[in-house]
Amino acid sequence: MIEDKGPRVTDYFVVAGLTDTSTLLDQEINRTDTNSIGPKAPITDIAVIIKSAGETVPEGYTCVEATPSALQANLNYGSLKSPELFLCYRRGRDKPPLTDIGVLYEGKERLMPGCEVIQATPYGRCANVNNSSTTSQRIFITYRRAPPVRSQNSLAVTDICVIITSKGETPPHTFCKVDKNLNCGMWGSNVFLCYKKSVPASNAIAYKAGLIFRYPEEDYESFPLSPSVPLFCLPMGATIECWDPQIKYPLPVFSTFVLTGSSAEKVYGAAIQFYEPYSQERLTEKQLTQLGLLTLVEKRVVSKPINSNKCICLLSHWPFFEAFKNFLMFIYKVSVSGPHPLPIEKHISHFMQNIPFPSPQRPRILIQLSVHDAFILSQPVSTPLPLSGANFSSLLMNLGPENCATLLLLVLLESKILLHSLRPAVLTGVAEAVVAMIFPFQWQCPYIPLCPLSLAGVLSAPLPFIVGVDSRYFDLHDPPQDVVCIDLDTNTLYVADERKNINWKQLPKRPCKSLLGTLRRLYQQLCSVHRKPQESSAIEMTPIEADYSWQKKMTQLEMEIQETFLRFMASILKGYRSYLRPITEAPSNKATAADSLFDRQGFLKSRDRAYTKFYTLLSKTQIFIRFIEECSFVSDKDTGLAFFDDCIEKLFPDKGVERTEKVDLDSAEDTRLIELDDSQRSEHTVFIMPPEPPPDDGNNLSPQYSYTYFPRLDLKLFDSPQKLKLCFNRHPPGSSITNSPALMAKRTKQEIKTAHKLAKRCYTNPPQWAKYLFSHCYSLWFICLPAYVRVSHPKVRALQQAHDVLVKMRKTDVDPLDEVCYRVVMQLCGLWVNPVLAVRVLFEMKTARIKPNAITYGYYNKVVLESPWPSSTRSGIFLWTKVRNVVHGLAQFRQPLKKTGQKSQVFSISGGQSDQGYGSKDELVKEGADGHAPEEHTPPELTTTELHIEEECDISAIVSKHLQPTPEPQSPTEPPAWGSSIVKVPSGLFDTNNRTSTGSTSTVLFSTQAPVEDAVFSEVTNFKKNGDRGEKKQKHFPERSCSFSSESRAGMLLKKSSLDLNSSEMAIMMGADAKILTAALTCPKTSPPHVTRTHSFENVNCHLADSRTRMSEGTRDSEHRSSPVLEMLEESQELLEPVVGDNVAETAAEMTCNSLQSNSHSDQSRDTQAGAQDPVNKRSSSYATRKAIEREDVETGLDPLSLLATECVEKTSDSEDKLFSPVISRNLADEIESYMNLKSPLGSKSCSMELHGEGNQEPGSPAVFAHPLERSSSLPSDRGPPARDSTETEKSSPAVSSSKTLTGRFKPQSPYRAYKDRSTSLSALVRSSPNSSLGSVVNSLSGLKLDNILSGPKIDVLKSSMKQAATVASKMWVAVASAYSYSDDEEETNKDYSFPAGLEDHHIVGETLSPNTSVSGLVPSELTQSNTSLGSSSSSGDVGKLQCPAGEVPFSRNIKGQDFEKSDHGSSQNTSMSSIYQNCAMEVLMSSCSQCRACGALVYDEEIMAGWTADDSNLNTTCPFCKSNFLPLLNVEFKDLRGSASFFLKPSTSGDSLQSGSIPSASEPSEHKPTSSSAEPDLISFMDFSKHSETITEEASYTVESSDEIKKTNGDVQSVKMSSVPNSLSKRNVSLTRSHSVGGPLQNIDFSQRPFHGVSTVSLPSSLQEDVDHLGKRPSPPPVSVPYLSPLVLRKELESLLENEGDQVIHTSSFINQHPIIFWNLVWYFRRLDLPSNLPGLILTSEHCNGGVQLPLSSLSQDSKLVYIQLLWDNINLHQEPGEPLYVSWRNLNSEKKPSLLSEQQQAASALVETIRQSIQQNDVLKPINLLSQQMKPGTKRQRSLYREILFLSLVSLGRENIDIEAFDNEYGLAYRSLPSESLERLQRIDAPPSISVEWCRKCFGAPLI
């Protein structure tokens, strides 16, 4: 067997003919139906006799006495008084036969040359056959005789008859009618002559043909040579014939045939027949007698030429008939000529082995065979239609329009169809066209285009068939009566009498009318263009010159004819998809029956009633039933079926509705359905030279080869077949869809074409172009999904994530470009056995109003049919659903109570328990006034921060909540229309004064930014009007950010840190955010006495004082990563009603943001410390209005199901700090209710912001702040103040232990504590989801839906835990946490809290704090533990996520959807960086900001996108300023954190990348292993921030974090040795995340030493540059730059890569090294859209990041969690302009400790920046433009535009979430246009406002981090 590979032009060369073993053909054929005597001699003479005159039939003649229907064959039939004339004929071989018979109207026509007229009868009378009087027109019969010397296969008249058409007679089968009436008189019938032509039979013996020779000798594996091939080469048999001497050799006859295999695979044959002399000596006596060579009497041998026929044939899977004809003719010519330098064998092997297959790149191959012989091999026309050898022009030319339409009807109704012709080359092309014209149906019955005589028995088969035969067959056989015979030579259809009424008029009228009209038009064109090919005779022996224009014209006509039939089929089947019935439940035995798959009755009712019979018959045919099956299941026809659906869509856009067909068809006329590939128009031609003759060495003459006839071929002279032949592809390129995972996401050619057209159309429309690019990015993710799922565990969760992304796409109005997204998920559901999810995907498509095409629908049904279904429906899913419904109903009834409860409550310490969630490990515990007692006496787990949550709720968020339109009247202070305000906070709040807005807390401060929350709680909170949604949408991505003001950072900080700052200080330090807070804080001061725990802003100010500097950075970060807590808050924000003064309405129930819990921890810890210092400061912070009231005073969380419980604010006393079971108080009702409302499956990961109280630190150990190193310029850099009393801190922060970030030593904790930690993680889990609640937890658990979770062991855990909940709810949390440990895993990692209010973003920690200022706010435990690690699902650190500030909402994207779909990694936009980095082994900073090569301007991401073209091969973008093209680059920088002491890798079972979220193993021991304090020294040193702030290395922070984390994990997993922490620390199943630069607490505290801290000298965040490596960290890998590809280009390249290398390439270590461009672009886009991915895991083990050594891949999903990817908007590296950007200056200026120390230049810069900030707050952009333009030096070329300077400064200084970029753009545009001309002259092109296209790109994708 020869190994196969690649499409071959031809497969086999065969010689067939008479062999020694051939048997007589007569023995092979059943002769029962043969004619009486076999072939007849040709007619040599005809005569007319007048019987009425007494003339008789001449001797040797036969008289035609009767017509076919037995009427008298009188030529004057029916005439009165006319003579009776009859026709007579004579047969014989004694002279040349007649070749034609005609009729001449004398006087009107001239006699044709070569014809003779019968003017007289044999008896001398006039032979006028007209029945009229003698004076009228005379009519004579004429004939033409063959020449004396003629070829053997020339045709002759073999029969003749007369028909009377007026009596209903028609020409008999195979007879040709002379279309001239013989009777022109008034009386008489219409009489016509008919005659039959055939090849005159000679004396011959027919044998069954055999195989004489084949090449190659061995079979191909995929295509063994069929033994029946010789029969098709010589369908009439191999004959020995005796010819008359005057007969000459005929030219070779070309024929084609098709072999259909059992798999319906077609093989095309092209053959040439010719005759050769046959030696008389080889004949036996019997043969001599049969041939008439041996006289019977004398036994004498007559000398006559004896010949036999032979055939040479090529077999191929491709119908290159014309090329094969040319090649075979060349071979034949060589075989009868000579001498030649090369043998025939060389030419054959050269053609078969050295001719490349035509491809789109080289569509034409010119093959030079010799000096005179050449021909072109053209690529097959590539359309989605099945490949065939159809010749539609031949069909139409030979049958005409009406007969074509009738034939179409016959085929559709599955008749027995017999095609016949004397031209064998015509048969195959026409038969192929007949089968192709019913597309999308496929003929299911026997199909033999050229049937050998030996197989003719099929004509008697009792089933439909399409068979083609040589017309000579009818010389031997009569056709069966029920067969429809179609004579291609005479253009006639012969239908049995009982079916005479069948014709084209039975087709539906309008489609048929359109069909016939078009066919008639094309028929006329064909007649003018068509060259009659010499198919029946030989091919021209002259050199062949390709007639391109004729070929092109014919190809065009061919496609138009095919398109006409396609249009007809589309019009009769339109709307059929609406009647397909998908399988939506476990399949039964009848699931695959046609009636189960298709609503036949519904379909019939929708059709034209007048043609119900036609449709009824059609719907019962095998072709229709098979069509329905193919539409319902995967088949190799899927591509064609999808194309057909597209055709219907084009012709009848409203498929489901029957519109008037007339309109449809008229409009359809102009629609092109089949289009030529671009390659068909290409002139690229490959020239192939003939084989080289052997070199002539001069001595020995090379042999010459001469032939007289075709030789016996010698295998030795052939070139040996090449060993490596490409495997044959059974289907034409692009026509097959395979099941291989690598090609799951492969688009069909039609989908690619459609995408190209759509791209060109969208390119001219800015909003559409942005959406188009955005949609392509999702497609990229789905293309990589098979690889992602393969390396994910569990698979169910990965699949659920995919489903959630589909939901997200719909909710954010992403229009899928094609169905690849859905198709891939469905196929994966089949691969990983999840039919239920496949059903959900199908219904998701329906919800999105997308009708699955054939490919998608086929995969869907295949999955649901073949996959095992869950056995029982009454499972936990069912039961939990009942519980959910009941609880949800109760929750709805309680809504009104909440409102009233809220109004009566004092804000007090909101969020005490309800926010945190009862039973959460971090349950709030009341602290005494001094805040120390609890530390001493309360077990760590109980010392939880009560206010923590409150802090999270940041004022702005709260206010913004109220800003949204609500039924309540809005405060007069709010601005009229927030859309037009750049700053989303009323400017009044930005006063530097402590302006009190007592009554205005409920007024709008920021425009709502929590669309997502909406989604989550929408069901519960119906107070909101729809109007809110629009505004909320704006918040979409960016606003989720954690900026201080918006995301409740304030809240977080407030609790703890607020104790240390006074409001005015804070306001100054924090800028706008603080001011807002300050304003809001004035209310709290009046809070009722009973509220023990209040926090003053003053404390906050401590931290904020200096954090202002960092705030901007934080803001930036925050935009990307608001902590989940914040998110929760935001979400809850929606639930809150506006409140006046202190009575902040809070819907606590809705607020079960467990994320808040995380905050409460941090708060509490802060409080504990701060409380001691400033008990007074513990005043209620009304700023937290946004969150539900925390019932910090609830001692035992009684009545966990009471929603009102959350709203009661009880008095708290110091004594309340006493220990109580925190877990029990978790509000389960809220949790469950929240779950019901939770719509965010993707958020499965939810930010694990656990609220851990601060861990107990050993007295000496400073509360080490795992303070992250500062992030680069675009990243915020926070520094936390030094811890005040580490001891105190330790004590006061029991929860810290569970906080991974926390640094500091912890004392061994009691088991109680240990289990509590666990519960915390649960709470974190819950918290993590933006709307955390149990439900959210559950939801987040696997990104899943309750249904998925509740199966298997997890549900048991949950059930059992529920039982315990009655007694000890905390245990439940423990159980659940472990059951869903994956959530914990990440969760715990991030468990602590989002940074204290804005710490992370706002760098709230101020340098002004003295080292003792208690780390309030930055207590190790709180700070160190960021609430969400990247992995956390709430959007952790999702810098890349589409962050659109309020105005930037991606089109009408329904933000609701966006939230849950967040990938775990980026899932928490609120993610605090500290936690992010705890688990971080590598930080990767990416920026797409590029520099135009021509003008040097900086081109930012959205501008690059807007500049891309619709060409998927063009890598360039267009510079928006100089319009030149350049290649944008993605710049990547790394910060390798693996050397840090606290970082160590540990395998985790998580299946998600950090970004995708982590899923730790489900079972981990929960015992707590104490850690010794030996590591303390390392940690302690970090606490003295004043001294070491700059030097705190990230490693150090790691150490701290790790120790914390380890403790926190309570030894859940295993103990690990750490270099800096000698003791083995127990660690959870997740690796530590490194809390790092993004504004997290890990950042260095002392900015003064590094003014550039917030501003990296590198393009990317400074954190990258922090090389201070106390612990010997490894050096960071060098930066990488790769071309930044458009999603169109990237998709094309990715598809090509997967097709060539398989999908495994995506998760192999070589991917990043071998395909860096594709890799980094995918990483960029997946982060940009916040989609889960395992790609980052490849970075850790890549050669690039390991000094050239490729490390083995351990666990991609695990490794991915260890890589934190940050997408940056700006790239400082590219700034070549002197000075630094304004936003960098602002950061640096604000990082200085004392303004008095600033130089004059710095003070001037500070004044400028401050002026600009204030102007922006007042919506004044003109002033900043003027200020900056005045400072510009005229004539100098700038790189930084005024637009970017002002925008970036606004975002950084005022808080990203507070800036509506869209409003800013509007204001900037107005200001720019209002500038006087002289001012405009000073400006440069780069200063112009962005174009609409740029704005839309940013709206869709959001803005990266700045």
Curated annotation (Swiss-Prot):
PROSITE patterns: DENN, MABP. Keywords: Cell membrane, Cytoplasm, Cytoplasmic vesicle, Guanine-nucleotide releasing factor, Membrane, Phosphoprotein, Protein transport, Transport. Phosphorylated in response to insulin. Residues 40-199 form the MABP domain. Residues 966-975 have a biased composition (Pro residues). Residues 904-917, 1154-1171, 1292-1302, 1548-1564, 1611-1628 have a biased composition (Polar residues). This is DENN domain-containing protein 4C. It comes from Mus musculus.
